[in-house]
Amino acid sequence: MAFRQRLAKPLLYTTGAAALGGGVLYYTYRPRNIPGQDPAVVGPPGYGAEGSFRPPRFPKVRSRDDQIGDLKRSGGSKGAATGLFKSSEEAAPQNDADVYDLLVIGAGATGAGIALDAVTRGLRVAIVERDDFASGTSSKSTKLVHGGVRYLEKAVWELDYNQYALVKEALRERKYFLDTAPHLSSWLPIMLPLDKWWKAPYYWAGTKAYDFLAGSEGIESSYFLTRSKALDAFPMLKRDNLVGALVYYDGAHNDSRMNVSLAMTAALYGATVVNHIEVTGLEKDSNGQLCGARVKDLVQEKNGKKADEFVIRAKGIINATGPFTDSIRKMDDQNVKEIVAPSSGVHVVLPGYYSPQKMGLIDPKTSDGRVIFFLPWQGNTIAGTTDAPTKISYNPVAGEEEIDWILSEISHYLSPDINVRRGDVLAAWSGIRPLVKDPNAKNTESLVRNHLINVSPSGLLTCAGGKWTTYRQMAEEAVDEAVKTFSLSTKPVFNAPDVSGTEMVDDGARLDGSCQTHQVKLVGAHGFSKTLFINLIQHFGVETDVAKHLTESYGDRAWTVAALSVPTEKRFPVRGEKISALYPFIDGEVRYAVRHEYAQTAVDVLARRTRLAFLNAQAALEALPKVIDIMAGELKWDSKRKEVEWRDSKIFPPNHPSSLSHSFPISLSLLLSAFNY
């Protein structure tokens, strides 16, 4: 008996250690779901019996004019803007079915997400945007889909449950993000250099906690690199004091293309989606409750016509205007207290040789205690961001002080052999983060990137704050509140639209009237696979870099984009005329943007359908004449309209390389002198 007792304890310890070790090994090497690795739902095109090539055919969104027609019908015969309906009868359109359940103001990430959520719950939805989809903050992010590793550090050290909950929510949403749009998002390893040995266990524990919280929603476990391996992976690193590095995984995405895809998916599901239409006021009934909005079509003004003004009727109105949240709230109540604390985030774009193609870098402690990222993106390198209180403006610009600060910070951890020059900055931009105010916070960086939902006494539902990663969760909560506040009835969507183009829209989403956006694949996702670019090369004869770019920007819609590209009259490439010799953007993208994505201006194309203006301001300037000419052919612009486009065009981000100019925005005189146009 005594012998068995002496043996039991060591066996118990050994068994426990083996179980723990086995669990760690399984967690480390468990099977992962990598977006885009699954076979495409929509197969490649085939050939007819006679050998003719048959590309896939996809559904088109309704025309902008048709969408505006629906908006006008919601206002009925009394569609002229009045400011106040005298009675509910006077305000009612001829057909109550034309009244929208929800009118969403603002088509950034939050607004477009709300529109998609609501329409897939069977609600009648309209969404309007003063400028373009993602024209504000939503196109000016760091391009990360992240859980917020620095918020986890705060949660631990400050014992802040709210920070922990934010990280947990973001990690879950990160998985949904990559599942529903695998062509627009991917996993990115991010290196954290270590300059002291004692930091290794500290940050190792932090990254492992990040892995643990992600659970099955992660992809790869974080790992340690020795000094030599860190330099091999990131040769640009400074060698002095480098003792090693930790690498963890987060998501990366193409923010404005994601935003456009959200809006187009909502449109395909039946939402009325219109950009370049400005809300000039809110309409109330005789009881003081909101029942509509007055709007103005800004495209008409560009076309030299009087702006078309009319009223949109809806049972509920949602304010999702990001930094401009309070301006819409003041339309409802001029005395309302502001709830947004705007913060400026500046990024700069450098040539691709500043970073490896498939690994980013994070500096967790800059000279002033902030965090800075250094990431590969679209063949270039993004560095940023700053975080400082700012004033709200429609076109915020990146100041020289912020640009110099970023360049100074990145020079601290790059090799002395690399001279970080102001002239290397290809583009820079400033985005305004719509942080929710906390009266106890001393600075904007300490604010949690959380969101709030507020309903005014007159019925204006405002969704403010948040970040790209959690846009879907924000939208779900906003629609839940709207259904309750406005007494709306959701219903199953039995005749789901053929988004995939092959009657294979069944992507796992069961549209039963509840929120299903965690399963609704966005336009382009159904037929996407990692090998799709090979099919494009074989069928259309496009260049390899172009084919990869098209599949990673449009998913299965790359077939349509390639088909819209002109023949080159060369042996190779057979199709696709580049709008910039330095980047893989081609003429077919401009036509596709106009015909399928509601692009109305050259900036819509250069900044948000393609990303040329964000990648290289000089290249965007040089591409502008070609883009305007293609759009003029598509939209039937006359010479006056082209002149207006030249005059009004503002290349974003509105800052050039120092070799050109530091002034912004680009003026017509500069454009004309540059191109003799």
How would you name each of these model-derived features?
Residues 134-168:
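Glycine-rich active-site loop/strand segments that organize a redox cofactor
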